[in-house]
């Protein structure tokens, strides 16, 4: 009799353990809100390059600048290289300053010519979630530029956030 009681008790304990494991699994799955935090919660300014006029560097409707481009972001008189010696670039994904309301981007071309693009923007603090914290979005309010190889620049989508859309169109003269 004792053996049968122990076997029943063991089965009851096994059932209770399995029930607890299943409840814990369900509870853990319910707690996961599938938060997908962007790396460093950084929103990037996406600049698409276009050619002015006809170009042999357009393949399937996408223009690629044929030479080397280095892009520097100037903040408080200091420069940081944000894109180094890109060859065949068709788009740029560049960080935006949290503290300034105008970013100064210096484009250095391989032939020694430089251009400067001034991106005026407002900063918009954005609460992502308790897991991800805060992020900074930006609203582009204006563009100015030098005219060495940059022919013109246009705002395509003024809101710079986590979405992968083109914010600025930059028209280059070859």
Label every PLM stretch briefly.
Residues 27-30:
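C-terminal motif of bacterial Sec signal peptides marking the signal peptidase cleavage site
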Residues 32-35:
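Bacterial signal peptide processing site
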Residues 62-115:
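Tryptophan-paired
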Residues 48-63:
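Structural motif
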Residues 109-128:
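Short acidic/polar inter-strand loop motif in beta-rich domains
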């Amino acid at each position: 009799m004792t053996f049968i009681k122990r076997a029943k008790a063991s089965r009851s304990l096994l059932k209770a353990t399995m029930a607890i494991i299943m409840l814990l699994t369900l509870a853990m799955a319910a707690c996961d809100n599938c938060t997908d935090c962007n790396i460093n919660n950084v929103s990037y300014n996406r600049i698409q390059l276009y050619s002015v006029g006809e170009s042999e560097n357009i393949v399937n409707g996408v223009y690629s600048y044929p030479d080397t481009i280095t892009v520097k972001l100037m903040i408080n008189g200091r420069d940081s290289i944000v894109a180094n010696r890109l060859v065949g670039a068709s788009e740029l994904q560049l960080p935006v300053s949290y503290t300034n309301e105008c970013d100064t981007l210096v484009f250095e071309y391989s032939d020694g010519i430089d251009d400067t693009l001034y991106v005026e923007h407002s900063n918009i603090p954005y609460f992502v979630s308790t897991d991800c914290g805060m992020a900074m979005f930006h609203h582009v309010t204006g563009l100015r530029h030098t005219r060495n190889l940059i022919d013109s620049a246009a705002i395509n989508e003024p809101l710079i956030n986590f979405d992968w859309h083109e914010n600025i169109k930059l028209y280059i003269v070859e």
